[in-house]
Amino acid sequence: MSMNGDGYLDTDEALRLLDLGIRNGALLDMAMSIDNRGTPIEGESPRTYADGKARMELLGYDVHAGLRIAPGASTASLSLSHLHVVRQSDAATASIASLLRNQTVGLTITVSIYRSGGTDTAQAEPMIEFVFTGGRVNEVAYLTGGSSGHPCEIVRFGYRVMSINSAPQLATGIRGAVRTCDLTAS
């Protein structure tokens, strides 16, 4: 996916990101939570999660990590992209816009991916979880289009640290041993 590099999403870029969420349908088993210093941003997800925290359903996400080597340098530095999430607009839309307007910093954004196929059991734990700390909302795009036609939004988050937790997930929804990696941009 190429971005034009000006730091802002134009409509064509937003429509390409919207494709992240609509290729496999709107009922993927992904969720996001946004914690604003202990206060969760609540959407309309009726699902109950193992940790009891409120989450918002996600249609898709995009984040990159890579090494960049400056000319003449002997070691590479770690580069982290912004986090883009694609979601259907809901009750949390105005709350997320308020985080942008107020330039709120210090958010914790958690993206959870479940393999168990959308089970409604509260014991389901994610097979992959991305936790972004030191976050802020940098941009929001509101649009319809693509094959979904539903009101959607793309939220671009900046952050300081990305933690990745992955584990095998059993058919019951419980996960096995967790592997962890923390990435901090240098």
Explain the meaning of each model-derived region.
Residues M1-S186:
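Glycine-rich, low-complexity intrinsically disordered segments
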